[in-house]
């Protein structure tokens, strides 16, 4: 599983209810993660933001 420095996070789409699960390094990335990924419901690339 993930090590001590890594945290499992949820990425939520800004335009739909689609979600991705990923891990991030807490030491290197202190702020909230924001990635552009493919949304399967909308069938296009949108911004996904870190959600708790």
Swiss-Prot record:
Keyword set, alphabetical order: Ribonucleoprotein, Ribosomal protein
Entries under PROSITE patterns matching the protein: RIBOSOMAL_L33 (PS00582)
Signal peptide span: none
Transmembrane segments: none
GO molecular function, one term: structural constituent of ribosome
One GO biological process term: translation
A GO cellular-component term linked to this record: cytosolic large ribosomal subunit
Top-level lineage group: Bacteria
Keyword Ribosomal protein: yes
InterPro entries for the chain: Ribosomal_bL33 (IPR001705), Ribosomal_bL33_CS (IPR018264), Ribosomal_bL33_sf (IPR038584), Ribosomal_zn-bd (IPR011332)
Entries under Gene3D superfamilies matching the protein: Ribosomal protein L33
Family: Belongs to the bacterial ribosomal protein bL33 family.
HAMAP family associated with the record: Ribosomal_bL33
Protein known as: Large ribosomal subunit protein bL33
Protein source organism: Chlamydia trachomatis serovar L2 (strain ATCC VR-902B / DSM 19102 / 434/Bu)
């Amino acid at each position: 599983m993930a090590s001590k420095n890594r945290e499992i996070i949820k990425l939520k789409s800004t335009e739909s209810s689609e979600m991705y699960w990923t891990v991030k390094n807490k030491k290197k990335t202190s702020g909230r993660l924001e990635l552009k990924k493919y949304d399967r419901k909308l069938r296009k690339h949108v911004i996904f933001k870190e959600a708790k």
